[in-house]
């Protein structure tokens, strides 16, 4: 009887241990704390009834062009894009434009480059929000910013968009949150020469580099699920760029696992030199914090 009880106890401990291990390896991507460097509202469009927004709202439905809505918009306008497939590149060179995908019955609007177009969404205005889109099959970039400040890029699914998935450059005060990216041949999320950027609660996988902070300052990277890339998290200085330094970067509470994917970066590119199996790479950057 004692032998049976011992066996039972051992089996019970094993089962509990396996259960604890399973839950311990489940990434927690829903922090209750406010962003650290980004200053502004991170309220999601899903927090309100997006279809009841009437004032300053332009609607785009399948068969329409999103770019025509941008051309009509004035600063402060909301552009609602309904589910459907849109084959175009969208340029936003105005301030304070909120571009929301409307999710209906689980379906989102899709920007499809058909392996012919270079970029999906390019913005240079300040106060830009881009939320709730599927972006796929572009040759260059999914979402790229050029000197746009006070931006929010949130809850987008970006697949197979060539060089970069999300790429703000020369921007200040930005939030990149709750996005899902894969199949990117350089960096899925690439923060280039920016200041005061929070990168939170994203999932990046099956890309060459997961999240890359290059020549940027005051950046927080936290609560991200970074898995099955060639390299996971990176912070470094690339010589020869207008901004020469990279410092005050915090990597915190990220779940980085199994970054052993084959490096399929373009020959001659910087990321092509990242060894497969790299979880965290810090090169020539200063004041980098890695915790939890």
Where are these regions (language model features)?
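Acidic Gly/Asp/Thr-rich repetitive segments characteristic of extracellular carbohydrate-active
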Residues: 48-87
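Hydrophobic alpha-helical membrane-insertion segments, chiefly the h-region
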Residues: 14-24
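Ser/Thr/Pro/Gly-rich low-complexity linker/stalk segments immediately outside membranes or between
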Residues: 25-51
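Right-handed parallel beta-helix
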Residues: 100-102, 108, 126-137, 149-163, ...
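Predominantly extracellular beta-rich ligand-binding scaffolds that present long acidic/polar faces
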Residues: 253-255, 269, 273-292
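Right-handed parallel beta-helix/beta-spiral solenoid domain characteristic of secreted/periplasmic
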Residues: 59-62, 83, 96-139
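Glycine-rich beta-solenoid repeat tracts in large extracellular/virion proteins
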Residues: 70, 89-93, 103, 118-124, ...
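N-terminal Sec-pathway targeting helices
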Residues: 1-13
């Amino acid at each position: 009887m004692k032998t049976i009880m011992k066996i039972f106890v051992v089996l019970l401990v094993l089962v509990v241990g396996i259960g604890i291990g399973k839950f311990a390896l489940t990434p927690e991507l829903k922090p209750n704390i406010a962003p650290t460097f980004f200053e502004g509202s991170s309220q999601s469009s899903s927090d309100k009834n997006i279809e009841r927004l009437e004032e300053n709202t332009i609607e785009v439905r399948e068969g329409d062009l999103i770019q025509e809505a941008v051309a009509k918009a004035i600063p402060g306008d909301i552009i609602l894009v309904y589910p459907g497939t849109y084959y175009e590149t969208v340029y936003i060179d105005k301030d304070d434009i909120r571009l929301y995908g409307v999710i209906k019955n689980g379906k989102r609007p899709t920007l499809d480059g058909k392996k012919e177009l270079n970029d999906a969404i390019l913005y240079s205005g300040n106060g830009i929000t881009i939320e709730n889109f599927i972006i796929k099959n572009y040759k260059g970039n999914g979402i790229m910013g050029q000197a746009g400040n006070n931006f929010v890029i949130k809850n987008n699914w970006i697949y197979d968009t060539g060089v970069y998935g999300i790429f703000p450059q020369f921007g200040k005060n930005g939030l990149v949150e709750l996005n899902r990216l894969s199949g990117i041949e350089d960096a899925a999320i690439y923060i280039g020469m920016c200041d005061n950027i929070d990168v939170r609660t994203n999932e990046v996988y099956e890309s060459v580099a997961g999240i890359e902070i290059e020549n940027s300052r005051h950046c927080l990277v936290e609560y991200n699920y970074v898995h099955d890339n060639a390299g996971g998290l990176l912070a470094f200085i690339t010589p020869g760029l207008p901004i020469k330094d990279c410092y005050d970067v915090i990597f915190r509470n990220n779940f980085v696992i199994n970054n052993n994917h084959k490096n399929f970066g373009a020959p001659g590119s910087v990321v092509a030199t990242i060894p497969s199996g790299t979880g965290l790479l810090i090169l020539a950057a200063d004041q980098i914090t890695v915790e939890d």
